[in-house]
Amino acid sequence: MGKVAVGATVVCTAAVCAVAVLVVRRRMQSSGKWGRVLAILKAFEEDCATPISKLRQVADAMTVEMHAGLASDGGSKLKMLISYVDNLPSGDEKGLFYALDLGGTNFRVMRVLLGGKQERVVKQEFEEVSIPPHLMTGGSDELFNFIAEALAKFVATECEDFHLPEGRQRELGFTFSFPVKQTSLSSGSLIKWTKGFSIEEAVGQDVVGALNKALERVGLDMRIAALVNDTVGTLAGGRYYNPDVVAAVILGTGTNAAYVERATAIPKWHGLLPKSGEMVINMEWGNFRSSHLPLTEFDHTLDFESLNPGEQILEKIISGMYLGEILRRVLLKMAEDAAFFGDTVPSKLRIPFIIRTPHMSAMHNDTSPDLKIVGSKIKDILEVPTTSLKMRKVVISLCNIIATRGARLSAAGIYGILKKLGRDTTKDEEVQKSVIAMDGGLFEHYTQFSECMESSLKELLGDEASGSVEVTHSNDGSGIGAALLAASHSLYLEDS
């Protein structure tokens, strides 16, 4: 063999070796990066763990905070607000009642005709009205005038089926889903606006007084019988159909719980004890925090960068507003530290809240062999054209970890309420039925979440006690609940 041929062979061999080394190095780098992805996944799973022992600690901490919040204002992270609702609907209510539900950029007006135990809700009608953006930041009178005018127009469409007896004033339940310091069943001052509203002159004002003045200005004769928040409304709606309902929980964009407490168990209540001996407490449980909550680095940074750092910690790990955002933050770390999506981080992945909880739910629910829905969601939301099956499996694992933690902590919260009420065990063979009325898009539409929550609650209660506890969906409880509370606190109860 000549020198040229030998030289060529050596060069070729060297080139092949170089390519082989490069391939091996890339494979090693790739396996190294994949190892980092799996390490991030494993650490996240461990930090989110909710063994039954931890859930019991969370439930016990919830019960302790409930006692503290009932003892004094400011004594707990749980506000434990007195709702002044001491007479929940029983099903006996009769007559025509109205509801106004204001909780965001739309409001609803509703009327219901109640026919007592036999007929229940005979008929109902509602209308949804959008609030023009300029009224959300304008003057208080302008906003309440707009609402009163819409209500007057709705009343004007009342047909003969909705009969109001002679000499009887129309009565309204007002669901107002903004922070309010309630001073009676039908009065409360606005603490602050949320959800894009910013009308400074209304802060500190009695919202019922503001609506009453607007009703007078438009010439509508209507008594506001009850001011309630959406969770108390859900409790009222649940109790109307089932006398065993003891609490209501909303799991939606946000989260909250309300329950029926013995009036004698509320040390901070200084008024006359209600005849019923009961009082509905609005817990504002989204603000619960405890050293027992399994918080991760992602939760801490999400909280730090939020508009209300240090507040609403439970809400930030269990509610629909935040679950998708937690997923985005973990994927971003995988992309930055382990090149999960390749050498460049998808620019869309850096946009906060771009992954919404409905997206996460759709991916988590993907049962196709190649996880096609996961691939298409990642493509549509993050503009990542292709993903491997093992990448999609990681995304599913993350969805499962985040949803499981949220669902199990929700169950621990409910268990804490049942413990406070002494309904977490069966006593002396006595079967005391306890029903929890649930509402909210997260509970209603995220199947894996709601199923995990219910199975975790059963696990906490044990076989015997879980037989006497039931979770039911109280669809749109807050809307009809306000009308039902107007009915149960009507001036005309005797007439009914």
From Swiss-Prot:
Localization in the cell: Mitochondrion outer membrane; Nucleus
Keywords: ATP-binding, Glycolysis, Kinase, Membrane, Mitochondrion, Mitochondrion outer membrane, Nucleotide-binding, Nucleus, Transferase, Transmembrane, Transmembrane helix
Main location: mitochondrion
Annotated ranges, domain Hexokinase: 35-487
Membrane topology note: Single-pass membrane protein
Protein name (Swiss-Prot/TrEMBL): Hexokinase-1
Enzyme Commission number(s) from the entry: 2.7.1.1
Family stated for the protein in its record: Belongs to the hexokinase family.
Classification of source organism: Eukaryota, Viridiplantae, Streptophyta, Embryophyta, Tracheophyta
Membrane-crossing residue ranges in chain numbering: 4-24
Gene Ontology molecular functions: ATP binding; core promoter sequence-specific DNA binding; D-glucose binding; fructokinase activity; glucokinase activity; hexokinase activity; zinc ion binding
